[in-house]
Amino acid sequence: MSEKHPGPLVVEGKLTDAERMKLESNYLRGTIAEDLNDGLTGGFKGDNFLLIRFHGMYQQDDRDIRAERAEQKLEPRHAMLLRCRLPGGVITTKQWQAIDKFAGENTIYGSIRLTNRQTFQFHGILKKNVKPVHQMLHSVGLDALATANDMNRNVLCTSNPYESQLHAEAYEWAKKISEHLLPRTRAYAEIWLDQEKVATTDEEPILGQTYLPRKFKTTVVIPPQNDIDLHANDMNFVAIAENGKLVGFNLLVGGGLSIEHGNKKTYARTASEFGYLPLEHTLAVAEAVVTTQRDWGNRTDRKNAKTKYTLERVGVETFKAEVERRAGIKFEPIRPYEFTGRGDRIGWVKGIDDNWHLTLFIENGRILDYPGRPLKTGLLEIAKIHKGDFRITANQNLIIAGVPESEKAKIEKIAKESGLMNAVTPQRENSMACVSFPTCPLAMAEAERFLPSFIDNIDNLMAKHGVSDEHIVMRVTGCPNGCGRAMLAEVGLVGKAPGRYNLHLGGNRIGTRIPRMYKENITEPEILASLDELIGRWAKEREAGEGFGDFTVRAGIIRPVLDPARDLWD
């Protein structure tokens, strides 16, 4: 698919300003430490505004009150988002208690936000609390290093509670890959943890002095579940097991969903199969993929800098051969694998080790005490008595993992009393949104605040057409950067302007096909009118077991995207 347009291995030209910033930052230090002490502004200035992203933070402001503050001649109410590094989403109950306390006492919104990259975020950290949050994380063995900007981000791992042996092995690899690809600079420890400056020269043997051209995302996935949505990621290790034991991985490279409205040089892309590798080559191959992208990725245009664009420019076979050369291996042919779904199994599931796992549906991943539903307090109470761990899923849900039979009733009682086990429809369980307003500076339309009532309306349509026990993978993202992974949904809404979305159709349930734009810049009533008609047709005309996305393609409602680099915008 990608050998049609082989281009130069390295793009020559004027480097972006981000490249200058990284080069001049002294390995990500900048003047962040000095800026912390500037009480005249609640934000970070100049390069530091972007450099803090390498330390796991984004500077934001409350957009609901931005205009009001401007009228009062006040600067925006700056506050930081902090994203924890949590490979595979596994967090101990001691760690949970610490983050619960910090969220309640030191953030504007008081919430913990589970993300679809298997970690948690704090929103609304004022500048005075920035250093304390890093120190709190460090005190319980966590950090926020490399969870944003041009590095390998939080490594995902299938949250499969049943296959406990396989999950344990895959999770260990997710941690190893994460550690191996971390930056080596001591800037994080010096700035946030007050560790002494050591008189050695910083080196970044893998990432290099200017780090990666763009963000880089990695997964470890255990078929048949594609809960981590591998095709949204740059580098994916698909677990291959023999007799229940992990023996190696299929490698898929070059997925990614971010686009720009109207810019046909941007596209969502599914990852390409490179081949199979035995376990012992995992870290060498991971490093080789990252360093190839480091050296060949486009540093002259950030909108064309991700791995997916590098693959399309140089060709898949050329990129693959370079990875083989650097890793000193030859890929074996891809081993058979298949995906059957991506949703979480909500409720109790018994593992093969006789322990139980309770998956709790958390709408939009937002953990807060709501009227009559004290979710945050309930989880804190469970954390105080639970001997196992918690696992954040890539669907923004939470698993109480490793519950002995004797503890089940106690934990279920707390969960039910806190509203953590309220019954929801299959449709709601399979819907997701990014944060968007009021905190995200890129948001063009509502997402998290829009989704609950939107799904009420979809539930009504599903009931009207007699398919309430079915679901459609439905996602809303507030802008085309695509954090809500709408570009792998059966029905994807991509924010265009306040109250307006592009409606994409034709993805599939297992997340292996990019949906195509069906209608542009439409309102919620227009979206619902379209879906009313289409859900009605699906209910009447579908074949046995046929998902909504597959139906829209077979019925000729939408043309499938076959080669997104070339036909996404047709």
Swiss-Prot record:
Its EC number is 1.8.1.2. Its cofactor is siroheme; [4Fe-4S] cluster. The keyword Oxidoreductase applies. GO terms for cellular component: sulfite reductase complex (NADPH). Pfam families: NIR_SIR, NIR_SIR_ferr. It is an enzyme of class 1 (oxidoreductase). Siroheme binds at residue 483. Pathway: Sulfur metabolism; hydrogen sulfide biosynthesis; hydrogen sulfide from sulfite (NADPH route): step 1/1. Gene3D superfamilies: Sulfite Reductase Hemoprotein, domain 1. Binds 1 siroheme per subunit. It catalyses: hydrogen sulfide + 3 NADP(+) + 3 H2O = sulfite + 3 NADPH + 4 H(+). It comes from the Bacteria. Keywords: 4Fe-4S, Amino-acid biosynthesis, Cysteine biosynthesis, Heme, Iron, Iron-sulfur, Metal-binding, NADP, Oxidoreductase. [4Fe-4S] cluster binds at residues 434, 440, 479, 483. Alpha(8)-beta(8). The alpha component is a flavoprotein, the beta component is a hemoprotein. Component of the sulfite reductase complex that catalyzes the 6-electron reduction of sulfite to sulfide. This is one of several activities required for the biosynthesis of L-cysteine from sulfate. Belongs to the nitrite and sulfite reductase 4Fe-4S domain family. This is Sulfite reductase [NADPH] hemoprotein beta-component. It comes from Escherichia coli O157:H7. The gene is cysI.
